[in-house]
Amino acid sequence: MQEIIIQVMNQFGYFGVAFLIMIENIFPPIPSEVILTFGGFMTTYSELGIIGMIIAATIGSVLGALILYFVGRLLSVERLERLVSGRLGKVLRLKPEDITKAEKWFLKRGYATIFFCRFIPLIRSLISVPAGSAKMKLPSFLILTTLGTLIWNIVLVSLGAALGDNWEMIAGILDSYSSVVVAILGVIFILGLLLFVKKRFFPKNKNYSPDSEK
């Protein structure tokens, strides 16, 4: 994977960077850390510049985020509510009100979420889908996405340029960081799933009292 990424970047320059970063947003397993840090290193031996590299990466990030945003718009809250109001909702123990609550939560805290999640592996890409489903205003989404990805790109491209031949060291550190974050997210997901199952399938009987068994 890394060799293919480097070949594309060497051959297509800025366009290759923008394309790869766009695909990385849609297909998170592609390592953006390698693209950005190697992109920074490329500026030390080619005609490509740091500013151009950052701009290309940011354009690619925003385009990829927009694709997922509109995927979220297709999978709207209204459609989700219709889905859970039928048999699927009974199986999952979900109600239309649950979808509405989730939408309200996202609209209340979604602006900060969109910005800060741009620094978290995996979530960085996927957060665009609920933003679209909740119908977050497109200008706000674009501004927050651009700011978050711009900061991320500036840091990694600059580190790659500063370290030169040692750019892979940063990519390795960030890969370890990504693995830890994904593991933590996995644990949180499992705990959340267990809590959801407990509440839905094993609800507490509020009317229960010791005297009721006598």
UniProtKB/Swiss-Prot annotation:
Keywords: Cell membrane, Membrane, Transmembrane, Transmembrane helix. It is found in: Cell membrane. GO terms for cellular component: plasma membrane. The chain crosses the membrane at residues 3-23, 48-68, 141-161, 177-197. It is a multi-pass membrane protein. InterPro entries: DedA_domain, VTT_dom. The keyword ATP-binding does not apply. Belongs to the DedA family. PANTHER family: ALKALINE PHOSPHATASE LIKE PROTEIN, UNDECAPRENYL PHOSPHATE TRANSPORTER A. This is Alkaline phosphatase-like protein.
